[in-house]
């Protein structure tokens, strides 16, 4: 299987690593968050504010279920793991890699990138989301990588698994 889908929290490095891997392998890359934004003509944050968190999740599922093996390197939104249908679908044509980045690092990155769209239900904090999703990331991933490694080390680790 030569396709890869990245899962993990927002700001864990999915898109950065995915783009770098795609570039190294000269393959295409797609970010499901960007597909949702393109489809709706708004940022994730604007979509969430206008239509609500559940709408974002439903859009994410639709976008993922429309993907196929022609998409070689895929970065999913952090909440994709809430849809078992989405995860099963990705698993039919790609290796699912979880970038397990410590909460402290994620919090720092989110602080720096405040423009980042983060679909968080009303009343929940990032540590709550992290703790809720972590078992789901473990459940659906074939491979777990340490997200505290440098981008280059993460890319090297992914490349080791790409042709298995």
Model-derived segments and their meaning:
Residues 6:
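Hydrophobic anchor at the beta1->P-loop junction of P-loop NTPases
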Residues 9:
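P-loop (Walker A) phosphate-binding loop of NTP-binding proteins
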Residues 13:
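Conserved glycine(s) of the Walker
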Residues 16, 20, 24, 134-164:
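NTP-dependent small-molecule kinase module
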Residues 23-34:
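Post-Walker A helix-loop "phosphate-sensing" segment adjacent to the P-loop in P-loop NTPases
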Residues 78-80, 102-104, 150:
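Short glycine-rich anion-binding loops that position phosphate/pyrophosphate groups of nucleotides
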